[in-house]
Amino acid sequence: MRLAPVAVALLLATAPPARAELLPDVSVHLRAARYAPARTDFHWQGWIGAGASLVRVRGARAYFTSDVETIIGNTLRAFEANQANYHLEAGVHHAAGRATATLFFHHVSRHYVDRPKVQAVDWNVLGGRIAWPVRTGPRPLRVTASLGHTTLDSLVGYRWEAIAEIDAEPSRVGAAALFTRANVRVVSVQERPRLDRGGFADVSVEGGTRWSRDGRTLDLFAALERRNDVLLEVAGAHNSALFGFRISYLR
């Protein structure tokens, strides 16, 4: 993850000192959800992470984010984590009219918890992303799309990765908004002997109630998802419903 300090150095070196702003914003977020139906290795899912824009120069911001995804089941104990997946990303955001364009380097590393693992399971993606606020105001609509290619992978064989997401708040009820979110991730795969499967698509659709105020957001949601490669070293897809909450804060 050497891209973050390189991006910061380039921005600082190419702009007048008076125009460089350090740490213009920071964010934290938390998500917890219950699988339905619950399976032995999949009872709960948790995400926790934080991020920061390290420096802002004119319309560009160098940033870094870090997230941990934890999968909880009851294989060994009634309530025990069995997977910990680390997501690290560094890059540069740049304003492009109403949209925001991003050049990013994303790293994912997956691990068992309290279990032996000899085979490394990780990958890096270098790519671009565009986030566009199609509609603002009391009923906002936001579209995000990205395309990237792996620069390194262990075991998984991933090559191209394309992601598209729509987040909309079609109506409001008092201080709350009803929201819906849909996400599709398409991955091309170079087949490997240990993982006998080709390319795939992950899909999730969720809806619920959202409260937002001064950069703070609480979502209560229900979701349906189809997710591939849920087990670290075995190919396969997992279809499930999830019920949970998401808290985020941007300052």
Where are these regions (language model features)?
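Transmembrane beta-barrel domains of bacterial outer-membrane proteins
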Residues: 18-251
